Amino acid sequence: MTIALGKFTKDEKDLFDIMDDWLRRDRFVFVGWSGLLLFPCAYFALGGWFTGTTFVTSWYTHGLASSYLEGCNFLTAAVSTPANSLAHSLLLLWGPEAQGDFTRWCQLGGLWAFVALHGAFALIGFMLRQFELSRSVQLRPYNAIAFSGPIAVFVSVFLIYPLGQSGWFFAPSFGVAAIFRFILFFQGFHNWTLNPFHMMGVAGVLGAALLCAIHGATVENTLFEDGDGANTFRAFNPTQAEETYSMVTANRFWSQIFGVAFSNKRWLHFFMLFVPVTGLWMSALGVVGLALNLRAYDFVSQEIRAAEDPEFETFYTKNILLNEGIRAWMAAQDQPHENLIFPEEVLPRGNAL
């Protein structure tokens, strides 16, 4: 029996090889297999958003004006979520709700579902693009792993949270002021700022900003003076092989400042990757919990004492009262289809009132 070792070569290229050669060709803008998902989905998501914010009203879903055509500006325009009565329908243009009528589809909130789903797949396509390029140039895939953080947040907030609630209606609309309203909603109905997963997310994002500032300043501080240029950008050749700054000097500086410092670049840069990505993932997990209506921290003993003792109040009990006020005011404003009416006597009043 003879075993032949060697690389198998095909006599002629099949369709897959031809497509692979064209998609992965070296060009100004890399396409790749991931581009088949990324570019169409990104085009449709952005196109849907620009169309919605320019022309489409939210009168039939939220009782609001939300387009430039109606007088909104960049901060107040939005592509609004579908009506609560449509629950979790995919709102396909050819589906039973719109029945192929594009105008009706826009009025019902079909553009939101269109933008959300295509946006999610576009983000996934962008992550796959980073995987594909990393593999092509023999890099490790940490860029793609890092980008999983924003994807996790987007999917949890825009898709998983409303799936856990009664419908897409309770997802954020795609607009600046609309996102602000959603944040207030999260605080009032879920006490989001006291949720430990939100705390970890804030620590991750702000900690990452601090790390970036410290790292950038430290590198600038310890640059080798081996160029004739007057500033950082002229003094160094962008293709030079040698290092441009002194890790040893940086280590000594921070050892004197804090008493501790990173001793090697791998651990330093892994930490800069770990902090924000972990923070984003923790936030995403917290939002998944909110989809299931899991509660934040409750300090019931303080609430009971505040109810019994007019002179006892903490920042926590004041925030609980504020949340009740947000719910009482926002529910009626935010869900006009429910015809909610709250009499004056049930509205929250703090000890100071």
UniProtKB/Swiss-Prot annotation:
It is found in: Plastid, Chloroplast thylakoid membrane. It is an enzyme of class 1 (oxidoreductase). Chlorophyll a ChlzD2 binds at H118. It comes from the Eukaryota. It comes from Arabis hirsuta. Photosystem II (PSII) is a light-driven water:plastoquinone oxidoreductase that uses light energy to abstract electrons from H(2)O, generating O(2) and a proton gradient subsequently used for ATP formation. It consists of a core antenna complex that captures photons, and an electron transfer chain that converts photonic excitation into a charge separation. The D1/D2 (PsbA/PsbD) reaction center heterodimer binds P680, the primary electron donor of PSII as well as several subsequent electron acceptors. D2 is needed for assembly of a stable PSII complex. This is Photosystem II D2 protein. One of its GO terms (biological process) is photosynthetic electron transport in photosystem II.
